[in-house]
Amino acid sequence: MEKVPITIRGFAALEQELKHRQQVERPRIIQAIAEARALGDLSENAEYHAAKEAQSLNEGRVLELESLISRAEVIDVAKLSGSKVKFGATVQLIDEDTEEEKTYQIVGEPEADVRSGRVSITSPVARALIGKGVGDTVEVSTPGGGKSYEIVGISFSG
């Protein structure tokens, strides 16, 4: 079973989502199925079919979350240090074309969210940054073409 690296914050979010799906969503969906069944003929009962589909999606996500949680390798980023980019690092970059500053934290796949500045360790950006230090320039291949960034800061905080 392949371990999945994840931060403490990311692991807590997975546990919270699992708890919500099991304790809130599951009972709500079961109630919706019961109410739809009470309406009669199930073959043409849109409410019943919608509730069953919601149940299927919810249970699928529950299984996925349980698998991720069982395979998680929780890493306390606050205990990490160093001068090179690695899992958990928060990296400040300057786009060499636009001079725009960007900040990314390198996290596990389940917790990645580019809009929040968290990129997956398997992403092109993270792969280009791993092992590099402040002052290094990295080339990143993106769907819109190549980008050059200079690393101007590396920090580790939870």
UniProtKB/Swiss-Prot annotation:
Entry keyword annotation includes Cell inner membrane: no
Q: Which family does it belong to?
A: Belongs to the GreA/GreB family.
Tell whether DNA-binding is among the UniProt keywords.
yes
Q: Name one Pfam family in it.
A: GreA_GreB_N
Alphabetized UniProt keyword annotations: DNA-binding, Transcription, Transcription regulation
Alphabetized GO MF terms: DNA binding; RNA polymerase binding
Source taxonomy: Bacteria, Pseudomonadati, Pseudomonadota, Alphaproteobacteria, Hyphomicrobiales
Q: One biological-process term from Gene Ontology?
A: regulation of DNA-templated transcription elongation
Q: What is this protein called?
A: Transcription elongation factor GreA
Please name the InterPro entries in this protein's record. Answer: GreA/GreB_C_sf, TF_GreA/GreB_CS, Tscrpt_elong_fac_GreA, Tscrpt_elong_fac_GreA/B, Tscrpt_elong_fac_GreA/B_C, Tscrpt_elong_fac_GreA/B_fam, Tscrpt_elong_fac_GreA/B_N, Tscrpt_elong_fac_GreA/B_N_sf
